[in-house]
Amino acid sequence: MAQFVYTMHRVGKVVPPKRHILKNISLSFFPGAKIGVLGLNGAGKSTLLRIMAGIDKDIEGEARPQPDIKIGYLPQEPQLNPEHTVRESIEEAVSEVVNALKRLDEVYALYADPDADFDKLAAEQGRLEEIIQAHDGHNLNVQLERAADALRLPDWDAKIANLSGGERRRVALCRLLLEKPDMLLLDEPTNHLDAESVAWLERFLHDFEGTVVAITHDRYFLDNVAGWILELDRGEGIPWEGNYSSWLEQKDQRLAQEASQEAARRKSIEKELEWVRQGTKGRQSKGKARLARFEELNSTEYQKRNETNELFIPPGPRLGDKVLEVSNLRKSYGDRLLIDDLSFSIPKGAIVGIIGPNGAGKSTLFRMISGQEQPDSGTITLGETVKLASVDQFRDSMDNSKTVWEEVSGGLDIMKIGNTEMPSRAYVGRFNFKGVDQGKRVGELSGGERGRLHLAKLLQVGGNMLLLDEPTNDLDIETLRALENALLEFPGCAMVISHDRWFLDRIATHILDYQDEGKVEFFEGNFTEYEEYKKRTLGADALEPKRIKYKRIAK
């Protein structure tokens, strides 16, 4: 094989109005290299992949794969035939084997004809069996079922037209992996995957013999799969050899040289780096330490010391001893039982990470806690001092014609944030919208910027109990880190639905895990501790993803 599978020479990309989002990038990609692409939202990461996939040809410089290199590309919004079933879409990836198996059955049937040309049939049979043998075709159904379980695909006979965006992405990813290209270009492959499916994908790509270039904000994924980090910074492509943790070390050293203008970002990075360096045991004690520090977090002096953090979660009223108690909760939709006899209580200072497959009922729990829906039976009791602040995962309700400042402030110079008042521009600035950025139209924002704006809008009520539904979606790593630090310093409680394992390990004091047939488990500890507990009590197979099973309600 050639020394490089893909080369880029002085590649640049200009977007209106004459802005260079990529400039003068020269890179060569080794066979089998695993590269994670990092950069702020809007840095040009998706553009880079579209160029490499040959979709965006309006560029400066040259970008080309070596001859005969087969490239597979997963965009953020993949296109599938809406008339196909899930099974038909997946079988497109292995059509050569599917067709060979069908034709082989026909050849066997033709042997029954006494006038058949047996020599010709035998030759065709041999050719077909070679194809099937080369791809382990006789085990094709087993391969497809295993992949469908791992990525929690919908039922085989489900129509693509009826699937959600997340379900379509999982089908497209499954199909792409089964195609086995020489080079995989993956734009946010972990989006819409739960933690167990991400872990499976991680192992798959680690063992994949081809080259992988992946845009992802999943830092365990970057730690466990990537051998290189490509950082896009102000149009330039900066390669770093090593995984995410080693990149963090190098980045810290680099920012030390740019200390004055990078002071806030460096402070945030150093907090995460301190956590990385502690190792597993030190990390696991963090959750307990947070609970023990709850009184300090509540103090006015402590809150004032943290007013310079990059992202700000306004504190609510002081929490009393009772926060949330759930007793014998049961909830169903139609004939599907989502929650069966769930009981738990949350102590002061807890941050509960909620995990489980999509569609298992995680958001439904939030709607019951906030009173938007009622349980079938059981009780949810909030403490008298609890004030809820909810952030849902839907960010389409914002007015695209308004500026960032107008969307949050409603045009007011002074805003009420919880029980206090503050200048609206100062509040918006606490979500990293500085200066001219506050004048940007909402419709011009990247996914990550919309995420920050969404947080700024919904957190201004100043709650002491946060319900955060997929707050990490579309956030770049800088903002993820800032959100983690803000949650760790928040003087209240939070329940957070997330599939980001690094995020859950840094912030969670407890885990609520949605499993099969309405079972939900409550565990004290972070995500890694919970995985170790499951492996210890249920065996390694318990960590393998499977398509979710709903318990049927007896009629």
UniProtKB/Swiss-Prot annotation:
It is an enzyme of class 3 (hydrolase). ATP 1 binds at G39, L40, N41, G42, A43, G44, K45, S46. It comes from the Bacteria. One of its GO terms (cellular component) is cytoplasm. Induction: Constitutively expressed, increases in stationary phase (at protein level). SMART domains: AAA (SM00382). It catalyses: ATP + H2O = ADP + phosphate + H(+). Its EC number is 3.6.1.-. Changing E470Q: Arrests growth, inhibits tripeptide but not dipeptide formation, stably binds 70S ribosomes, probably locked in an ATP-bound form as it should not have ATPase activity, 47-fold decrease in translation. SUPFAM superfamilies: P-loop containing nucleoside triphosphate hydrolases. InterPro entries: AAA+_ATPase, ABC_tran_Xtn, ABC_transporter-like_ATP-bd, ABC_transporter-like_CS, EttA, P-loop_NTPase. GO terms for molecular function: ATP binding; ATP hydrolysis activity; ribosome binding; rRNA binding; tRNA binding. Keywords: ATP-binding, Cytoplasm, Hydrolase, Nucleotide-binding, Protein biosynthesis, Repeat, RNA-binding, rRNA-binding, Translation regulation, tRNA-binding. Residues 95-139 are annotated as: Arm. A translation factor that gates the progression of the 70S ribosomal initiation complex (IC, containing tRNA(fMet) in the P-site) into the translation elongation cycle by using a mechanism sensitive to the ATP/ADP ratio. Binds to the 70S ribosome E-site where it modulates the state of the translating ribosome during subunit translocation. The arm domain (residues 95-139) is inserted in the first ABC transporter domain. When deleted impairs fitness in long-term (up to 6 days) growth in stationary phase. Probably contacts ribosomal protein L1. The P-site tRNA interaction motif (PtIM domain, residues 242-322) probably interacts with the P-site tRNA(fMet) as well as the 23S rRNA. Belongs to the ABC transporter superfamily. ABCF family. Translational throttle EttA subfamily. Monomer at concentrations found in vivo, exists in a slowly reversible monomer-homodimer equilibrium. Probably contacts ribosomal proteins L1, L5, L33 and S7, the 16S and 23S rRNA and the P-site containing tRNA(fMet). This is Energy-dependent translational throttle protein EttA. It comes from Escherichia coli (strain K12). The gene is ettA.
